[in-house]
Curated annotation (Swiss-Prot):
It holds the Pfam family adh_short. It comes from the Eukaryota. The active site is at Y151 (proton acceptor). GO terms for molecular function: alcohol dehydrogenase (NAD+) activity. It comes from Drosophila flavomontana (Fruit fly). InterPro entries: ADH_Drosophila-type, NAD(P)-bd_dom_sf, Sc_DH/Rdtase_CS, SDR_fam. The gene is Adh. One of its GO terms (cellular component) is cytoplasm. GO terms for biological process: alcohol metabolic process. Coiled coil: none annotated. This is Alcohol dehydrogenase. Its EC number is 1.1.1.1. Homodimer.
Length: 254
């Protein structure tokens, strides 16, 4: 999907990977970039507007843990202004296995709820035009960082949800793919809590191995958006974009 002249909603578009991705997106010339984030960052919004003044960049405060009804209300406001939305990026995430309930609420339930809410506007069974969803998951959804099992499990759940969305596209008209970054040098991984403090140095240990920058990840993210492949499982690791071939071990046959 060419980004030029598209309307894009980016949940958590002001974080580490999120902000660099927002920068790369505005360079590609969408018509509108709507950023939904828990924390306002006027400086970042001003920077995005300055990168490409032809792009309309707007911000709405948003916490992905709110009920679906509240998200739907916010989306009604956005759709009323834009008329159409082409792409939803679900990017909210936390890495802190001390916060078990919040990790699941942000990393998994929030993605499900935001997706559920936008279906009210996109689902072709309701007369909607369809749309595209890019869910930011993680390579830990493939193989866990076992010292942070709650985080890893939440990302595996988000990946499974995304794979199902892609299979449902013939019914809903909404396509989906997952973005799975490897270890990326962001504040998220510099220091974080392992589950039950099983490894207090887990963040430091990860950074002793090869990593990637947020810019490298963001540039490959834009390439994945442009590829627009329904059901794709994109691995963004060490500056490379790799299409993962998922191994099927079981099938429901329905």
């Amino acid at each position: 999907m060419a980004i030029a002249n598209k309307n894009i909603i980016f949940v958590a578009g002001l974080g580490g990977i999120g902000l660099d991705t927002s920068r790369e997106i505005v360079k590609s010339g969408p018509k509108n970039l709507v950023i939904l984030d828990r924390i306002d960052n006027p400086t970042a919004i001003a920077e995005l507007k300055a990168i490409n003044p032809k792009v309309t960049v707007t911000f709405y405060p948003y916490d992905v843990t709110v009920p679906v009804a509240e998200t739907t209300k916010l989306l009604k406001t956005i759709f009323a202004q834009l008329k159409t939305v082409d792409l939803l990026i679900n990017g909210a995430g936390i890495l802190d296995d001390h916060q078990i309930e919040r990790t699941i609420a942000v990393n998994f339930t929030g993605t499900v709820n935001t997706t559920t809410a936008i279906m009210e506007f996109w689902d072709k069974r309701k007369g909607g035009p369809g749309g595209v969803i890019a869910n930011i998951c993680s390579v830990t959804g493939f193989n866990a960082i076992y010292q942070v099992p709650v985080y890893s499990a939440s990302k595996a759940a988000a990946l499974s949800f995304t794979n199902s969305l892609a299979r449902l596209a013939p019914i809903t008209g909404v396509t989906a793919y997952s973005i799975n970054p490897g270890i990326t040098r962001t504040p998220l991984v510099h220091r974080f809590n392992s589950w039950l403090d099983v490894e207090p140095r887990v963040g430091e240990l990860l950074l002793e191995h090869p990593t990637q920058t947020t810019l490298e990840c963001a540039q490959n993210f834009v390439k994945a958006i442009e590829a627009n492949k329904n059901g794709a499982i994109w691995q963004l690791d060490l500056g490379q974009l790799i299409a993962v071939e998922w191994t099927k071990h079981w099938d429901s046959h329905i």
